[in-house]
Curated annotation (Swiss-Prot):
This is 3-ketoacyl-CoA thiolase. Its EC number is 2.3.1.16. GO terms for molecular function: acetyl-CoA C-acyltransferase activity. GO terms for biological process: fatty acid beta-oxidation; phenylacetate catabolic process.
């Protein structure tokens, strides 16, 4: 079976969904920009030799509809002979895109794939056109479709206090801002055209979603966003609404050698699981455990974790049950996470994997694990190993 390696991994800056940098940019353009950038950064690879493009996107309607992967590839002037498919596993879409490409390469059905994902939550809101089947309530609690309430449930089951959530959210912003100031994100962000507050076209090379002024004290004044009577989850401890895309160049290790391209990491294992929709945010725990089992590793073997921060109330129970509470500051989301950067649904799996690989290189780490919860009760995880 072929070894699958990541040769390159990049992303756009994360733009605010409400009147942000990409308010006049379309999701297809953000995607095409990264496709072109990956090819330009790796000139020994010709676009015509790509076997397939796998692109994650959740709200596949309006500008994100009609197979956005193909639309973006055509905009990027990738040869018409290269196919492209849009993947949807809700929040885990672009990580699923990575898994799909990896399996094609492992089985020898492909050698080189472009992988990534996008979501423009400013143009296509998360709830746009959603119409749950009325009979679903016979099998699943109605609140299971309301992500904030599932986070409330997790916090109550695991004893996660409001103060713990506020502290974690403040940490996310502080670490993301520190990474921005130190230049840690420069290796992953591709400058991307957008418009500033005055409508002037400019290149953005930083995440505009981060709020460096965030403090625990300020967060403590916010009202509960989902359960106004007895809730603890606020807008400040939830992932920000943002627009963005991320992309990875994935290939067999043998093809990378032929092209003279240096692999940055290999995929050691992959896993996806289901869980109770009412505690959908718990998915990273069984997914991570399964991925670790497949890799022949334990949580203590992992040097760096990237865990998508859907909500502080959601990620803290996962950290707790993976036995990592005492190692948060050494191993978990060292450059902040989605609370600070946002969670553009179809983008986030590739985004956290990209950030993880860059962190592994900076820390000279051997193993890293990226994992996410998924709406309606799933979890997905990938173990990476430095080459």
């Amino acid at each position: 079976m072929e070894q699958v390696v990541i040769v390159d991994a990049i992303r756009t800056p994360m733009g605010r969904s409400k009147g942000g940098a990409f308010r006049n940019e379309r999701a297809e353009d953000l995607s095409a920009h990264l496709m072109r950038s990956l090819l330009a950064r790796n000139p020994s690879l010709t676009a015509a030799t790509l076997d397939d493009i796998y692109w994650g996107c959740v709200q596949q309607t309006l500008e994100q509809g009609f197979n956005i992967a193909r639309n973006a590839a055509l905009l990027a002037e990738i040869p018409h002979s290269v196919p492209a498919v849009t993947v949807n596993r809700l929040c885990g879409s672009s990580m699923q895109a990575l898994h799909d490409a990896a399996r094609m390469i492992m089985t020898g059905d492909a050698q080189v794939c472009l992988v990534g994902g996008v979501e423009h939550m400013g143009h296509v809101p998360m709830s746009h056109g959603v119409d749950f089947h009325p009979g679903l309530s016979r099998n699943v609690a109605k609140a299971a479709g309301m992500m904030g309430l599932t986070a409330e449930m997790l916090s109550r089951l695991h004893g996660i206090s409001r103060e713990m959530q506020d502290q974690f959210a403040a940490r996310s912003h502080a670490r993301a801002w520190a990474a921005t100031q130190s230049g840690a994100f420069k290796t992953e962000i591709i400058p991307t055209g957008g418009h500033d507050a005055d409508g002037v076209l400019k290149q953005f090379n930083y995440d505009e979603v981060i709020r460096p002024e965030t403090t625990v004290e300020a967060l403590s004044t916010l009202r509960p966003a989902f359960d106004p009577v007895s809730g603890t989850v606020t807008a400040g401890t939830s992932s920000a609404l943002s627009d963005g895309a991320a992309a990875m160049l994935v290939m067999s290790e043998s093809r990378a050698r032929e092209l003279g391209l240096k692999p940055r990491a290999r995929i050691r294992s992959m896993a996806v699981v289901g869980c109770d929709p009412s505690i959908m945010g718990y998915g990273p725990v069984p997914a991570s455990k399964l991925a670790l089992k497949k890799a022949g590793l334990s949580a203590s073997d992992i040097d760096v974790f990237e865990m998508n921060e859907a909500f502080a109330a959601q990620i803290l129970p996962c950290i707790k049950d993976l036995g990592l509470m005492e190692q948060i500051d050494e191993k978990i989301n060292l450059n902040g996470g989605a609370i600070a950067l946002g969670h553009p649904l179809g983008c986030s799996g590739a985004r956290i994997s990209t950030t993880l690989i860059n962190l592994m290189e900076r820390k000279d780490a051997q193993f890293g694990l990226a994992t996410m919860c998924i709406g309606l009760g799933q979890g997905i995880a990938t173990v990476f190993e430095r080459v």
